[in-house]
Amino acid sequence: MSTRTATQPALTPKQFELVAKALADPRRMALLEAIGSEREYACSKLCRVFPLSKGTVSHHMKELMNAGLIQSRKEGQFMHFEIRREVLAAYSAELMRRVVRTD
């Protein structure tokens, strides 16, 4: 019996690996937690809140986007990020499927 719902897409093995690698970095995890604490989070605010250079923040945002964990929206000259909850849910479900015995 599948526990996946219509709003919870399956991740390909490559997507699962990208998410796992993205979440393994403590700085990316901290950035993701900050973004998740608000509906949207401005890139400029991330640069103020975290003791990281703009280039480092940009690199980590690109990795999180490549993994599908966040999406961006440009408003004028400002970039805003938000969590893609459906990807986190799919990753969590796949992780449970892989590591927890269900019988």
Briefly describe each language-model feature range.
Residues 1-16, 33-37, 84-103:
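Amphipathic alpha-helical dimerization/coiled-coil segments
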Residues 61-62:
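Short, hydrophobic-biased segments on the C-terminal half of alpha helices
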